[in-house]
Amino acid sequence: MIRSLHLTDVAVLLLFLGKSPVNEAKVRDRLTSREVELLAAAPLLRSCLISDDRQCSFICVSRGFIQALVSLKRCRGPGAWMVDRLLLSPGREELCRDLLERTGFADDKIKAERLFLRLDSSSPALDMAKQSGFTHYLTEHLYYLEETRQTEPPESSLISRPRSSADEHGLFRLYTAASPLKVRRAEGMTLQEWSQSRDKDATRELVLEKNGEISAWLRIRLGRTAGRFEIVTESGAEELGQLVNYSLAALKGRNPVYCLVSEFQQQLQHILEEQGFSRVSSYACLSKQLAVRVPEPQLVPLRA
């Protein structure tokens, strides 16, 4: 039986998490860290205890025990949500499809139009996710550099500063120019759709300008020891190399360093490999269109 997670499920939830179920969902802020699933109890217990419009969970129960769980979390806006956790008991991977199909009817709880899911490219859940209505629209690669060299910010004509709310339109124009149509259709063809679909990864964001226009967008995450960066730009190889060096300088003292790269950023991949990075993981990014409520027609008096 698949149903929502309730307050009365606290005990069986802790028992389920204590068995170290496999989490197939790969959210951006946990790509480079290992989380003990028992530590996931806090946000999941919170969803049991408090009614929240930013998170909800569904469980598959058999003989009184939880066999699988999917947790959904709101992105930046209410129109887009992501699968935050997809926990499966060992040997019960077949439950994945039914659980993900249930998310297609979650609009009664989350009022969303789109749902996003990131899986390891080799995950057994990938085919089942496609069977349940998800579409694979993008592959991402995670690059790894074990030891960073001491790098100072390079001299260039680029001007960097912290991202501000006033940059939203400029960043959307950059995203639109740099991303393929297939990706934009999934993540957002309009500023509102794109803005709502972005996740809430805790990063330091920098924009770089050239001739008064935003030419690059850097997302830098500082972990306790490791660091990660992402680059969105249309720049050529020379400026891309400068952006990589700039990111490494911003992550000075962090080891190892990771870079998340979209499959269409082939030039960036070559530059990373030239600088000693190795590809360590690949991820499938999927999206699913949820049922959209259509207002029921209402009869109104006809005026003479």
Model-assigned labels for residue ranges:
Residues I2-R63, S132-T225:
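Amide-forming acyltransferase catalytic core, primarily the GNAT-like/NAT-type
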Residues T8, V12, P78, S123-P124, ...:
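Short alpha-helical
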Residues S57-F58, W81-V83, L100-G104, L142-Y144, ...:
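Short, structured motif recognition centered on aromatic/hydrophobic residues
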Residues F58-D98, G104:
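Long, hydrophobic/aromatic-enriched structural stretches that serve as scaffold segments
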Residues P78-G91, R221-A237:
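Conserved acetyl-CoA binding element of GNAT-fold acetyltransferases
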Residues G91-D107, Q131, G236-A250:
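Conserved acetyl-CoA-binding loop-helix of GNAT-fold acetyltransferases
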Residues D107-D120, K252-E263:
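Conserved GNAT acetyl-CoA-binding A-motif
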Residues S122, S132-P153, V257-A304:
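Active-site/acyl-donor-binding loops of N-acyltransferases
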